[in-house]
Amino acid sequence: MPHQQILMLFGLLPVATNISTWWNFGSMLIACSTLQVLTGFFLAVHYTANINLAFSSIIHITRDVPYGWLMQNLHAIGASMFFICIYIHIARGLYYGSYLNKETWLSGTTLLIMLMATAFFGYVLPWGQMSFWAATVITNLLTAIPYLGTTMTTWLWGGFAINDPTLTRFFALHFILPFGIISMSSLHVMLLHEEGSSNPLGTNSDIDKIPFHPYHTYKDLLMLAAMTTLLLLIVSFSPDIFNDPDNFSKANPLVTPQRIKPEWYFLFAYGILRSIPNKLGGALALTMSIVILLTVPFTHTSKMRSMMFRPFMQMTFWLFAATFMVITWTATKPVEPPFTLIGQAASMIYFLFFISNPIMGWLENKIMKM
């Protein structure tokens, strides 16, 4: 039977014996993606993409639809779990040199951009106060593009301000983009298994591989069980932990919130945007904070793939991870000293990681020759 052959191929997939828990996040992302598509479909059935009814339809789903509260909370918290997993997945790729599999890395970065766009469109759909103002601020950045900016913004809004056509467009985009993500994920997995996974040592795994099943299957299932447990605990006991209090009020274009901020998983990029006082400069920095990941495979100069035996790069990497968290924290604070200065310093260190990567590699090569 064809499905038995597929299962056999999957079970016999050769995998390095020494890949650690950090390699489990790929399968967890597939699980998150499946959860988001399923819960998203059931929510879309009851959602109304109209500025007068959108907020009420979310309340209707939560109160009146059987298990609607569960679908809504699973979808919202599931998005946060998705981003936690994807950030760890990217960090593992940076630490262990997985980016040297160039096609896989480039397709993965494209996936990240698509995922961030999908999450942004989804954040606008409840039409709460923070949804509306976050959409206004972020989409308004398009006007910074010379010549085409104003036309592009008007086209995206469907008019001269955020209104009903904007919500309809965002709902359509939020619905269609996950199918693009599924297609790109399939390509990502195919490109990965063409060359095979790396391992913590960064060495060639061909001499020491075992079938994927049963060892790695159970390893994946353990992490999936842990993630599912955490997800259900948050959904059951603290479903609003990631929500902004302002978003429990219906969107009002006449009242500006004290602090406009997107969801927590965009705060690092928003913090970088805020740290530059110039509009065009901020928009470029925001874009570069994600697009710069595309440069990593082409700037690797070290003779060693993994950072496991590179103490200088390890220090740089953990400084980068700490900087990511600091930028996220500063983005939640008011635009006033000392937060502006901390944000600017942290943003500089964020980009310095990508500049220092090839320099550190070159220095390590020199030291090894001594």
From Swiss-Prot:
Could you give the cofactor binding note from the entry?
Binds 2 heme b groups non-covalently.
Amino acids binding a ubiquinone = 193
Coarsely, its chief localization is: mitochondrion
> Keywords assigned by UniProt?
Electron transport, Heme, Iron, Membrane, Metal-binding, Mitochondrion, Mitochondrion inner membrane, Respiratory chain, Transmembrane, Transmembrane helix, Transport, Ubiquinone
Whether Ubl conjugation counts among this entry's keywords is: no
Q: Which Pfam families match?
A: Cytochrom_B_C, Cytochrome_B
Q: Which SUPFAM superfamilies match?
A: a domain/subunit of cytochrome bc1 complex (Ubiquinol-cytochrome c reductase) (SSF81648), Transmembrane di-heme cytochromes (SSF81342)
Q: What cofactor does this one take?
A: heme b
Bilayer topology reads:
Multi-pass membrane protein
> Which InterPro entries does the record match to this protein?
Cyt_b/b6_C, Cyt_b/b6_C_sf, Cyt_b/b6_N, Cytb/b6-like_sf, Cytochrome_b, Cytochrome_b_C_euk/bac, Cytochrome_b_N_euk/bac, Di-haem_cyt_TM
One biological process term in Gene Ontology: mitochondrial electron transport, ubiquinol to cytochrome c
Give the record's family classification. Belongs to the cytochrome b family.
The entry's other comment says:
Heme 1 (or BL or b562) is low-potential and absorbs at about 562 nm, and heme 2 (or BH or b566) is high-potential and absorbs at about 566 nm.
- The name of this protein is Cytochrome b
